[in-house]
């Protein structure tokens, strides 16, 4: 009799749990794509289980932001990725790393997005580090970037706070890939952009000093821009600028070399050592000229004598 009662009790508990899960599924099946708020309830390996009030949801390891730490009883907001009703019964899957989490935060924070005056055209995210979001306005009088930033940056600050200080770049959308790349790679100044429509590659040329800005830390800026516009963005330094600079140096060095009777190679070495004019050559010690040009010191003295002769003439 006791075993039968125990079995009946276990069966009843299982049915109750199943009924609760079915209620969960019915309540949440249409809420995929929303943001919900809950309390961290427990951990199972790297998965986080979150109490949503009546029900428990799970944020799997793959949906976590790797730079975030969670503790029991922490209140967190998350995006409902899916409501599944398979194998183990109904389950609510949450995410804080999904790009649509950022999308929904903007929709709740920016009234112009909520009323569809401003549209989010594209979004690319490396959760915990950086997000790029491209926005467009139906109304010419409404600045889409300004609307998202808010007065004194209030709107975007609220979003960044929710994302634990993840960088958020808000970009003006353009149907022209060139214009969009130029916006997305700011603050780097673009020297030239060429498009390979067949391979969907954007070749971007920047100056030496802008190269690291355009590529970003560990290539992040260029990588996110590629995802944002759905083209492969390849950034390279402007070699022609360097070539023009080298040509000017070589030309000036050649002129100096002709005056002093030096080969182009020695003249270039002298020029790079600081001997840009005859007057500056005369200020250089003979031993310094000798070591810079890799010549014996008597030859360095001959160069100085020639420079002295030319300036005195």
List the predicted regions and their residue ranges:
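RNA-contacting regions in translation and RNA-metabolism proteins
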Residues: 1-313
């Amino acid at each position: 009799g006791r075993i039968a009662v125990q079995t009946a009790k276990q069966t009843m508990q299982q049915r109750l749990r199943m009924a609760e899960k079915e209620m969960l599924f019915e309540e949440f099946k249409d809420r995929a794509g929303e943001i919900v708020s809950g309390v961290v309830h427990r951990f199972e390996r790297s998965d986080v289980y979150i109490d949503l009030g009546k029900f428990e949801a799970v944020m799997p390891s793959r949906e976590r932001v790797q730079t975030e730490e969670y503790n029991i009883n922490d209140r967190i907001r998350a995006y409902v990725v899916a409501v599944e009703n398979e194998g183990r019964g109904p389950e609510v899957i949450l995410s804080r790393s999904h790009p649509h989490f950022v999308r929904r935060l903007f929709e709740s924070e920016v009234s112009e997005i909520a009323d569809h005056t401003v549209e989010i055209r594209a979004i690319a995210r490396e959760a915990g580090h950086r997000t790029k979001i491209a926005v467009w306005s139906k109304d010419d009088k409404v600045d889409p970037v300004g609307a998202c930033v808010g007065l004194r940056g209030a709107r975007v600050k609220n979003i960044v706070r929710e994302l634990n200080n993840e960088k958020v770049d808000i970009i003006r959308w353009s149907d022209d890939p060139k214009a969009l790349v130029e916006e997305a790679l700011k603050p780097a100044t673009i020297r030239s952009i060429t498009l390979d429509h067949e391979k969907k590659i954007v070749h971007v040329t920047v100056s030496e000093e802008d190269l690291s800005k355009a590529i970003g830390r560990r290539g992040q800026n260029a990588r996110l821009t590629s995802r944002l516009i759905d083209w492969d963005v390849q950034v390279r330094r402007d070699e022609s600028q360097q070539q023009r600079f080298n040509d000017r140096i070589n030309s000036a060095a050649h002129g100096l070399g002709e005056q002093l009777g030096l080969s182009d190679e020695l003249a270039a070495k002298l020029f790079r050592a600081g001997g840009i004019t005859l007057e500056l050559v005369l200020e250089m010690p003979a031993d310094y000229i000798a070591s810079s040009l890799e010549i014996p010191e008597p030859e360095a003295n001959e160069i100085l004598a020639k420079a002295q002769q030319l300036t005195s003439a």
